[in-house]
């Protein structure tokens, strides 16, 4: 079976080609690992995105199942894409799936509204019900395992934003799943640098356990529950990016590197990797200030 995954445009950004969306590339990698054929349409920075989609659906090798990711400001474009596919390919589109941060957060909020019998608000519930009209399946939370059932299910919602869900990734699953399928997109079109060195983003940890009031994800287990990859899996990905793309800059896009108890050992292994290849990397990442220690600082400085 072939599935087409789509990254909608983000014209609200000053530059749409800074960091590629790794989440949907992780899903693509999971599909490829199970011998699915995957097409990726990256519409970041593409103004004539409908024309691009039209060209794709007129190919003989087009997919019949489509998966779209969307942040909140991308949702209007995701809806337009979904409607276009269904209108242009009536009977040929078996399913259009929506995942990503927006539907996850709205579903989380809708569950909280329902628990209060919708006293005070039902805005999130209305949003989710509206999305159900446009998409065949909504995937909330981790998509790497949920995608397989999303392709075949008759349910409208797959709730992977639940620690008891079979789709909610454990530390071990997060470590052994394949790295993002970056080969499916034009990585050279993404421009980010650290001290003048071209860099790519890497995710070593999921989740943030803190309760900052400004954060819309604080009620979502998917965004709150810490899941860390093994040091070995992170180093393997970094080494692969260096060998494949010649990448010497790495942006660790974790919420806080130093909630990972293995952070110091990971920094030490990054040192060893640079010594192995005789190269100097440029690294960047976020830390939680009140958790920051001298030992962590020394390890980061060495790396």
Report the location of each language-model feature.
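Glycine-rich beta-alpha loop elements in corrinoid/cobalamin-binding modules
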Residues: 2, 30, 34-171
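Nucleotide-activated donor-dependent transferases that construct or modify glycoconjugates
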Residues: 2-14
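Hydrophobic/aromatic residues located in beta-strands of well-ordered beta-sheets
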Residues: 3, 95-96, 250, 283
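Residue-level recognition of beta-strand->loop/alpha-helix junctions
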Residues: 7, 42-44, 219
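Residue-level signal for short, function-critical loop segments
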Residues: 9-12, 72, 102, 206, ...
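Glycine- and acidic-residue-enriched helix-capping/strand-helix junction motifs
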Residues: 12-24
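Conserved strand-to-helix beginnings and helix N-cap segments that scaffold or border functional pockets
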Residues: 17, 50, 78-79, 144, ...
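Radical SAM [4Fe-4S] cluster-binding motif and immediate context
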Residues: 175-303
């Amino acid at each position: 079976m072939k599935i087409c995954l789509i990254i909608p445009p983000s014209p609200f950004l000053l530059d749409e080609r800074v960091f590629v969306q790794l989440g949907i590339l992780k899903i693509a990698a999971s599909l490829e690992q199970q011998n699915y054929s995957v097409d990726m349409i990256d519409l970041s920075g593409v103004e004539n995105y409908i024309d691009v989609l039209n060209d794709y659906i007129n190919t003989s090798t087009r997919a019949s199942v489509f998966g779209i990711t969307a942040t909140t400001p991308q949702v209007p474009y995701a809806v337009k894409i979904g409607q276009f596919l269904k209108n242009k390919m009536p009977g040929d589109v078996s399913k259009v799936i929506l995942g990503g941060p927006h539907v996850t957060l709205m579903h989380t909020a809708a569950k909280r509204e329902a628990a209060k019998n919708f006293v005070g608000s039902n805005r999130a519930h209305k949003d989710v019900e509206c999305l159900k009209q446009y998409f065949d399946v909504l995937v909330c939370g981790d998509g790497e395992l949920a995608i397989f059932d999303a392709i075949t299910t008759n349910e409208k919602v797959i709730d992977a934003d639940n620690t008891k869900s079979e789709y909610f990734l454990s530390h071990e699953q997060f470590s052994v799943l394949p790295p993002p399928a970056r080969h499916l997109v034009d990585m050279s079109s993404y421009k980010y640098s650290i001290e003048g060195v071209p860099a790519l983003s890497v995710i070593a940890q999921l989740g943030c356990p803190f309760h900052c009031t400004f954060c819309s994800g604080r009620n979502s287990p998917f965004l709150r529950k810490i899941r860390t990859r093994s040091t070995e899996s992170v180093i393997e990905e970094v080494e692969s990016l260096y060998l494949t793309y010649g990448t010497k800059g790495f942006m660790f896009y974790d919420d806080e590197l130093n909630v990972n108890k293995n952070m110091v050992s990971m920094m030490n292994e990054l040192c060893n990797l640079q010594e192995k290849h005789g190269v100097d990397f440029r690294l960047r990442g976020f830390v939680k200030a009140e958790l920051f220690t001298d030992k962590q600082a020394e390890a980061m400085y060495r790396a």
